[in-house]
C-alpha cells in the first residue's frame, strides 16, 4: 500500500510553530538549548486531525527572531519537493502592526505575476498557519512569519508553475494537509472509493484534475460535497461515475490539461500523451485561422502562450478567435466524454465543461457546463 505524506504548507507551519515556541521560551527566560528540536504537533484542519512533524533545527537569529527548519515528506507521491528544507523565520512584531500574524514569502516562494507579485501562499496554507500560530499567542503578542524555500527557485524550473503565473519559486498550494500518492496505482482505487461515497449523496459531480481546479471550484461557490479530484485518471473516473449512477459531470480544469479530451486522450499525464499544441492548432485550422497564426499557435511553448496570442489577435483585429476556438473545444470535450462513457458502459451521462487560464479566470463554459454549474452551486 502506498504511503501518504503531508503537503508543503504543513511543513511550513511546523517550522513556524517551532520558531515561535523557541521565541516564547526565550521570552520566558527558559534558556532553551539551540539545535535539534525533535518535533511539534499541529492541527491539519483538513482533515481535522493532529499530527506530529519532525523539526531538524531551531535557533535564535537575533533579538526577537528565531529560525526553524523542517523537511518535506510527501509520502510515496512522486513529488519534486521530497526532502527539500523549509525554513520559517518568526519575529516579534512592532505594536503598530495591525494584524497579530503577518505571513510573508521569502526566497524560493513563488510570486503571482497577475497580482503585483504577491507571494503564492494560498488560502489553506494561510488558514493553517494562522490557526495553529494564534493558539500560541496571547492577546497582545504579534509576529511576522517569513517562509523560505532555499531550493524553491531551482525546483520551480521543473514544474509548470509559470503556466499558472507563478514565478521565481514554488507555491504553498493545496486544500488538504495530506499528500496522497497520486502516481501510485492504489490512488485510482482511492479516488473511485471517494467517488462511490459521494455518488450515494449527489447525482451531479464536479471533476477537478488538481488543486488549482479544487481551489477555483470553492471560490465559485460549488458545493464541496460534489467535488471529486481525479488527477490524470479522467477516463477511468468517468466510467466509474457512470456505473455509480451519476447523472451529470462538470469537468472543471485548466485548458492546457482538459484540451487533451478534445483529442480523445483520456489519461492526461504528459508521459502518456502530450498533444496539446497539435489539438489546439487542428481546431483552429478547421475554423479558418490564417496560416501565419496557425504557425504561431503550433510553435508556442505552452497552450497559455498560444491563448495569449489569440487574445492579442482578437484585441488588435476585432476578431473572435478565442470564443470560436474554445467554444468548439468544449463542445468536443463534452461530446467525446459522453461517447467514451457510452463505449465503456452503454450509459448516458450529461457532461459539461469549464476551462480556465493560468490566472484561474474562466475562458469558456459549454452549455452543459453552465447548466451543471447551477446544479452544483450552493444556494
Swiss-Prot record:
Pathway: Cofactor biosynthesis; adenosylcobalamin biosynthesis; cob(II)yrinate a,c-diamide from sirohydrochlorin (anaerobic route): step 6/10. Disulfide bonds: none annotated. Keywords: Cobalamin biosynthesis, Methyltransferase, S-adenosyl-L-methionine, Transferase. GO terms for biological process: anaerobic cobalamin biosynthetic process; methylation. Pfam families: CbiD. It comes from the Bacteria. It is an enzyme of class 2 (transferase). It catalyses: Co-precorrin-5B + S-adenosyl-L-methionine = Co-precorrin-6A + S-adenosyl-L-homocysteine. Its EC number is 2.1.1.195. The keyword Methyltransferase applies. GO terms for molecular function: cobalt-precorrin-5B C1-methyltransferase activity. SUPFAM superfamilies: CbiD-like. Belongs to the CbiD family. PANTHER family: COBALT-PRECORRIN-5B C(1)-METHYLTRANSFERASE (PTHR35863:SF1). HAMAP family: CbiD. This is Cobalt-precorrin-5B C(1)-methyltransferase. The lineage of its organism: Bacteria, Bacillati, Cyanobacteriota, Cyanophyceae, Gomontiellales. The gene is cbiD.
Amino acid at each position: 500500500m502506498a504511503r501518504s505524506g503531508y503537503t508543503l504548507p504543513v511543513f511550513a507551519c511546523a517550522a513556524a510553530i517551532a520558531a515561535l515556541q523557541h521565541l516564547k521560551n526565550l521570552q520566558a527566560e527558559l534558556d532553551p538549548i539551540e539545535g535539534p528540536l525533535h518535533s511539534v504537533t499541529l492541527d491539519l484542519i483538513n482533515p481535522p486531525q493532529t499530527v506530529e512533524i519532525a523539526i531538524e533545527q531551531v535557533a535564535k537569529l537575533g533579538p526577537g527572531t528565531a529560525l526553524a527548519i523542517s523537511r518535506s515528506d510527501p509520502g510515496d507521491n512522486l513529488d519534486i519537493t521530497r526532502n527539500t528544507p523549509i525554513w520559517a523565520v518568526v519575529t516579534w512584531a512592532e505594536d503598530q502592526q495591525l494584524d497579530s500574524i503577518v505571513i510573508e514569502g521569502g526566497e524560493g516562494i513563488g510570486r503571482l505575476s497577475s497580482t503585483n507579485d504577491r507571494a503564492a501562499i494560498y488560502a489553506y496554507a494561510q488558514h493553517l498557519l494562522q490557526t495553529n500560530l494564534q493558539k500560541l499567542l496571547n492577546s497582545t503578542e504579534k509576529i511576522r512569519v517569513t517562509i523560505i524555500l532555499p531550493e524553491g527557485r531551482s525546483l520551480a524550473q521543473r514544474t509548470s508553475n509559470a503556466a499558472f503565473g507563478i514565478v521565481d519559486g514554488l507555491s504553498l498550494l493545496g486544500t488538504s494537509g495530506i499528500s496522497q500518492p497520486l502516481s501510485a496505482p492504489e490512488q485510482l482505487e482511492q479516488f473511485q472509493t471517494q467517488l462511490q461515497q459521494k455518488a450515494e449523496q449527489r447525482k451531479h459531480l464536479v471533476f477537478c484534475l488538481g488543486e488549482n481546479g479544487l481551489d477555483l471550484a470553492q471560490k465559485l461557490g460549488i458545493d464541496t460535497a460534489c467535488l471529486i479530484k481525479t488527477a490524470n485518471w479522467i477516463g477511468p473516473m468517468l466510467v466509474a461515475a457512470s456505473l455509480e449512477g451519476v447523472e451529470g459531470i462538470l469537468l472543471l480544469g485548466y485548458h492546457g490539461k482538459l484540451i487533451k479530451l478534445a483529442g480523445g486522450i483520456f489519461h492526461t499525464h504528459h508521459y502518456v500523451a502530450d498533444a496539446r499544441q497539435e489539438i489546439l492548432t487542428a481546431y483552429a485550422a478547421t475554423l479558418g485561422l490564417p496560416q501565419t497564426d496557425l504557425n504561431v499557435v503550433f510553435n508556442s511553448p505552452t497552450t497559455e502562450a498560444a491563448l495569449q496570442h489569440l487574445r492579442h489577435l482578437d484585441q488588435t483585429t476585432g476578431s473572435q478567435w478565442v470564443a470560436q476556438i474554445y467554444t468548439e473545444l468544449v463542445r468536443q470535450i463534452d461530446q467525446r466524454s459522453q461517447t467514451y462513457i457510452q463505449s465503456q458502459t452503454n450509459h448516458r451521462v450529461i457532461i459539461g465543461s469549464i476551462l480556465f487560464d493560468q490566472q484561474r479566470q474562466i475562458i469558456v463554459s459549454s452549455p452543459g457546463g453552465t447548466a451543471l454549474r447551477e446544479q452544483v452551486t450552493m444556494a
